[in-house]
From Swiss-Prot:
Protein name: Beta-ketoacyl-[acyl-carrier-protein] synthase III
Region ACP-binding, annotated ranges: 262-266
Catalytic activity: malonyl-[ACP] + acetyl-CoA + H(+) = 3-oxobutanoyl-[ACP] + CO2 + CoA
Localization per record: Cytoplasm
Single Gene Ontology BP annotation: secondary metabolite biosynthetic process
Keywords on record: Acyltransferase, Cytoplasm, Fatty acid biosynthesis, Fatty acid metabolism, Lipid biosynthesis, Lipid metabolism, Multifunctional enzyme, Transferase
GO terms for cellular component: cytoplasm
Gene source species: Chlamydia pneumoniae (Chlamydophila pneumoniae)
Length: 335
């Protein structure tokens, strides 16, 4: 699935922002909590540490702080934002939406605000909606926020999952293309609900509401079949990436920067190898932050932008994969 509403109007990312909690949970810390080792974690994931939010650093707040940075970097005032999209898999509440809570924190009044749920692919799904809104002329300045406090749903007695996830938030402002922005080409998105149970949070919704049994059996924690997820992640992201490159009208060798979902260094390296992208052009932060879910790609993009390494006419390939199962890719162009 992809969006391209108005060929005469091109949406672009004007500016980015991100937020990461101060608390660091290292592999050495995890060695004291579960039967694991730094070598075991790094060999399988590439992760050395991750950030963990404090009790008052909830999802909506992390997203709102990232949003404040993005709005400032775009040179806009908050009252110029006319739509807010909040991508998250770990909302503050089932309702009200995390977007509404972030809106209140930002002091932005009366604009449409809603949550987008596509797990770790949420940043790209939200970007597709923002692009459509801008190119259709529905809104002028769309604020996309992606944040997750996954530590609230991690079982820190399960060595297979507790080593993977961290907390954080990212944001960007999308408007009509202007010099210095990152133009958004047509996105390639997909999902396969038949495989949803491979990566899920089993309880807490209407299908399996909270109960004494669900609490005792640990069904409020993230459940994942790692080997199966790995297999589908590489294949689906490769397909989406090829499709997005074709939609952008360029060749694989034209890609200047690869900005993948920061879930596992082995997955990142496998994808980079398939596209023959030089290691110096592959942006990695997974070793520092682990998998921050919907905010993952956004945090990576923000860090890359602030290195000032992106040059005029550079092409950036963003890819993501997450629960659903869901996946997506897009090519951005620096103009």
């Amino acid at each position: 699935m992809w969006f391209s509403v108005n060929k005469n109007k091109k949406a672009a990312i004007w500016a980015t922002g991100s937020y990461l909690p101060e608390k660091v949970l290292s592999n050495a810390d995890l060695e004291k909590m579960v039967d694991t080792s730094d070598e075991w974690i790094v060999t399988r994931t590439g992760i050395k540490e991750r950030r963990i939010a404090g009790p008052q650093e909830y999802t909506s707040l992390m997203g709102a702080i990232a949003a404040e940075k993005a709005i400032a970097n775009a040179g806009l005032s908050k009252d110029q934002i006319d739509c807010i999209i909040f991508s998250t898999a770990a909302p503050d509440y089932i309702f009200p939406s995390s977007g509404a809570l972030a809106q209140a924190h930002l002091g932005i009044e009366d604009v449409p605000t809603f949550d987008c749920q596509a797990a770790c692919t949420g940043y790209l799904y939200g970007l597709s909606v923002a692009k459509a809104y801008v190119e259709s002329g529905t809104y002028n300045h769309v604020l996309l926020i992606a944040a997750d406090k996954l530590s609230s749903f991690v079982d820190y007695t399960d060595r297979n999952t507790c080593v993977l996830f961290g907390d954080g938030g990212a944001a960007c402002v999308i408007g009509e293309s202007r010099p210095g922005s990152l133009e958004i080409n047509r996105l390639s998105l997909g999902a396969d609900g038949k495989l949803g149970e491979l990566l899920s949070l089993p309880a807490g919704g209407s299908r399996c509401p909270a109960s004494k049994e669900t609490l005792q059996s640990g069904k409020h924690f993230i459940a994942m079949e790692g080997k199966e997820v790995f297999k589908h992640a590489v294949r689906r992201m490769e397909t989406a990436a090829k499709h997005s490159i074709a939609l952008a009208g360029i060749q694989e060798e034209d890609i200047d920067w690869f900005v993948p979902h920061q879930a596992n260094e082995r997955i990142i390296d496998a994808l980079a190898k398939r596209f023959e992208i030089d290691e110096s052009r592959v942006f990695k932060s997974v070793h520092k932050y682990g998998n921050t879910a919907a905010s993952s790609v956004g945090i990576a993009l923000d860090e890359l932008v602030h290195t000032e390494s992106i040059k005029l006419d550079d092409y950036l390939l963003l890819v993501a994969f997450g629960g659903g199962l869901s996946w997506g890719a897009v090519v951005l162009k620096q103009v």
